[in-house]
Amino acid sequence: MFTQANLFLILLLAIALIAKNQSLIIAVSVLLLIKLIGLDQKLFPAIQSKGINWGVTVITIAVLVPIATGEIGFKQLGEAMKSYYAWIALGAGILVALIAKNGITLLAEDPHITTALVFGTILAVALFKGVAVGPLIGAGIAYLVMQAVQHFTS
């Protein structure tokens, strides 16, 4: 029961409890429960390979609820597009998607980066009440910074 992985998860749970971070508490508790009941070999590969997509899908559903309820329609969209804030948000959405594209390349070429990204995400979630938005954005930002460093040092 006290493997290095379990000890690490228990440590993360303690950090989450101290930081009062509900998302991390739930995530670590679910992982420990899956391990405890012995389904880790079956479930972890699926969670690891598809979990980010599931999470993005759930977030997308939550964001689209106002459209589904009729709270936001074409009229509101048209009115919003008259605001420069909406154009900034549109540009930010495009930029983030393009940055994430480079993250896929970096994670494929250097899987060790994943460990640092995961640890950075855990620290931000646990200690600074950050939100785990996925490693692709982090890897994309890391890729851009690495390219800039390489450009200026070579």
UniProtKB/Swiss-Prot annotation:
Signal peptide feature range: none
The organism's place on the tree of life at top rank: Bacteria
Keywords for the protein's UniProt record, in alphabetical order: Cell membrane, Membrane, Transmembrane, Transmembrane helix
Location of the protein in the cell: Cell membrane
One GO CC term on file: plasma membrane
Membrane-spanning ranges: 8-28, 54-74, 87-107, 117-137
InterPro entries (alphabetical): UPF0756_TM (IPR007382)
Membrane topology term: Multi-pass membrane protein
Pfam families the UniProt entry points to: DUF441
Family named by the database record: Belongs to the UPF0756 family.
PANTHER family named among the record's database cross-references: UPF0756 MEMBRANE PROTEIN YEAL
This protein's name: UPF0756 membrane protein BLi03063/BL00400
